[in-house]
Amino acid sequence: MDILEILQDDYRKFPNDQTYSLYADDVYFKDPMTEFRGCDRYRQMIGLIKTWFLNPQLDLHNIQQTGSNIRTDWTLSWTTPLPWKPNIQITGWSELTLNEAGLIAAHIDYWHCSRLDVLKQHFGKF
């Protein structure tokens, strides 16, 4: 399988059984909530999603590669473990940059909504 096929499979299985070997040891990650370096930290972040989100799902809408850049368009959804169990949805895209070894050296996520919009989804019923 090539990297696009592996990523498609990872999205389908998310957050379980991710292929961390695709990522450089010092991978740079950034999204509207956090920013860090390191594959171990990336693993921990996915672990937190598995622990704190109910029924997380990452739907891949599009994936394309141009040279050393990969763009994915997606929707992340989950249920937050609050008494009223709000369903949360974020649409966005990721820009991945491959290093010379073909590993993901940077993974930057962008959202089509603000952090406040995500917070409001948690309390929309009140």
Language-model features: locations:
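C-terminal and inter-domain tail/linker signature
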Residues: M1-F126
